[in-house]
Amino acid sequence: MNKKILHLAYLDKFIPGFIEIVRQHFAGEPHTVITFGDIKKYPYVQSSSIFNFSTLNSFRSIFKLVVAMHLNDKIILHGLFSSHLVILLCFMPWLHKKCDWVIWGGDLYYHRLAKKDTRYYVMEVFRKFLISRLGGFITYVEGDYHNAQQWYHTSGKHYECIMYKSNVYSGATLSEEALIHTEGQGLPKVNVQIGNSADPTNNHQQAFEKLSKLDVPNQIGKVYCPLSYGNSVYAAQIKKLGEAMFGDKFFPLMDFMPLAQYNKILDEVDIAIFAHDRQQAMGNTINLLGRGKTVYMRADTSSYALLTKLGIKVFSLDDLSLAVQSREVVIANNQRVCNYFSEENLVNQLKTIFS
């Protein structure tokens, strides 16, 4: 008999795609999905077993949540961002061992990112109590699981899973013949992408300064900078800085665009620079590496360690140059990305978690 599984999800851009996966591949199994957030921003079709609450601070939503948590065999927490949910679970310790946490990144690194005020210290007491008792931890970045063990003294099981469709490579399998044809076109300048969002953890200014020390006028065509997701005030500041430093070569992406349109931009990129000091931008990174793009990131991050472990070549930000990687590296990276970051692998990993 299949386990009854409850998904509690902070509603973000990853979740509608995950709901599609559940409906497509696990339709005959007893899954309930409760999301909380702005469904107008991240819409999906609701049903009796898959539905949204705008907040978790009403009696009705909390009551339905508590009932659902007790009726299901396993609870999967998609992102641990809601203070209401953390506190609520702390007062039901008998549920903790059947809870698995899908680590997103920002929720794990909360102690680094949050403002250190009274609210932070109170919440960290609740978080430490809850996280230390959880039954499972879901992430494909092994370093993040080890960080959870170190920071929160966890003992729960590690489930390796790429979890969301945003981590599934959406491009083509590359052939040597196609690459030879592209190289024959002799493009004189490279296009660069910096960061993946308007989050200060992108460290845009640091990346801009590193890039500006290279031969920007003669070797760079465009500098793409995705800023549509995150802090709008910070986005405006980075747009202004980028235009000041790179002039008409700077292309800030300020508005959300359809995935197909965004993928066309990824196709144009030759070199990507990610200056994050933690695991972040993995969806972008995966799809750029799969497309044969040269990716630079900090070598002290868990994402760098993961990709290196998978045999995928990434370069240290300290060694930034405008030379693109060899054809052999392009082919090898594409093959490894296609094999690991596939929907087939995702579904198999989910089957293990759900069993």
Regions found by a protein language model. Give the residues of each.
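Active-site proximal beta-strand in glycosyltransferases
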Residues: 74-76, 92-113
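Nucleotide-activated donor-binding/catalytic signature segment of Leloir-type glycosyltransferases, i.e.
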Residues: 237-256
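A charged, aromatic-enriched C-terminal amphipathic alpha-helix characteristic of glycosyltransferases
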Residues: 13, 323-355
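A conserved mid-protein helix/loop that constitutes part of the nucleotide-sugar donor-binding site
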Residues: 13-20, 199-213
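Short N-terminal targeting/anchoring amphipathic segment
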Residues: 7, 64-85, 98, 271
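Nucleotide-sugar donor phosphate/pyrophosphate-binding loop at the beta->alpha transition
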Residues: 109-128
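A short, active-site helix/loop in glycosyltransferases that binds the activated sugar's phosphate group
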Residues: 124-177
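Conserved donor-binding/catalytic core segment of Leloir-type glycosyltransferases
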Residues: 7, 179-202, 208, 223-225, ...
